[in-house]
């Protein structure tokens, strides 16, 4: 795991958690717009830190490592946690941690991907396909349709894939996504949590229902015309929405 710090050391603290096959560089266009006001901590999970020496295991394991970092470096306090796609798993575990205090959290694209009896078959097939994507930097047309993504947006994401991603890490991220919503997260009635997603994303209705069981005050925001992960490709809009959420 790698955590990079940017911006105003005296500003509000913000941590960014990336999506699948990505690393901290998924936010490279966003960070310059945040640096003046915020102290930004951009994370690369195990298996996606470009070293080839780490392996992604579970969302809970990543959350535990982040909690230890926040305890040590930030006195256990974080003002805002922003998680994209894969990052939403560690985020919900981190929010439930008794050792850290997170004031606000945004889950971007936390799709419900549990397909029940098909999960085992998916775990046999999809990690291999996504591993190929990581190394060939190519996304087939069916995957673009599934994500609601444009070719141009996907090319931007493909350029940000780090080196040395293993099949073991990819398989672990798929398991994390398929089974995330089977976890019974503690109810946090006063938690300031938002769920953001693109209009073209699928599998969000069930996700929102499950998230509301943990966060009864959940704020839901749908972005018209966007697919999965596309909000990050519009950094100025994302920053304005972050600032608006901060004022709620």
Predicted features by range, described:
Residues 4-52:
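Conserved HGGG/HGGXW glycine-rich cap/lid loop of the alpha/beta-hydrolase fold
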Residues 117-118, 133-187:
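Conserved alpha/beta-hydrolase catalytic His-Asp/Glu region
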């Amino acid at each position: 795991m790698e955590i990079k710090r940017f911006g105003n050391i005296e500003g509000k603290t913000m941590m960014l958690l990336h999506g699948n096959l990505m690393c901290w560089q998924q936010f490279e266009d966003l960070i310059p717009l945040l640096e003046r006001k915020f102290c930004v901590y951009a994370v690369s999970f195990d298996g996606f830190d470009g070293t080839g020496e780490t392996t992604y295991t579970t969302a809970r394991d990543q959350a535990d490592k982040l909690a230890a970092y926040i305890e040590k470096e930030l006195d256990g306090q974080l003002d805002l946690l922003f998680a994209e796609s894969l990052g939403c798993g560690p985020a919900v575990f981190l929010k439930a941690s008794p050792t850290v205090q997170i004031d606000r959290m945004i889950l971007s694209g936390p799709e419900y991907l549990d397909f029940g009896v098909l999960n085992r078959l998916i775990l046999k097939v999809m990690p291999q396909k996504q591993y190929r994507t990581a190394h060939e930097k190519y996304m087939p047309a069916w995957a673009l349709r599934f994500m609601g993504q444009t070719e141009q947006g996907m090319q931007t994401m493909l350029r940000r894939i780090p080196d040395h991603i293993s099949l073991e890490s990819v398989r672990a991220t798929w398991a994390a996504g398929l089974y995330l919503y089977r976890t019974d997260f503690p109810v946090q009635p006063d938690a300031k949590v938002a769920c953001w997603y693109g209009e073209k994303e699928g599998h969000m209705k069930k996700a929102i229902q499950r998230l509301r069981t943990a966060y009864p005050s959940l704020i839901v925001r749908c972005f018209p015309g966007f697919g999965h992960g596309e909000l990050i490709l519009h950094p100025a809009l994302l920053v304005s929405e972050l600032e608006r959420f901060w004022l709620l």
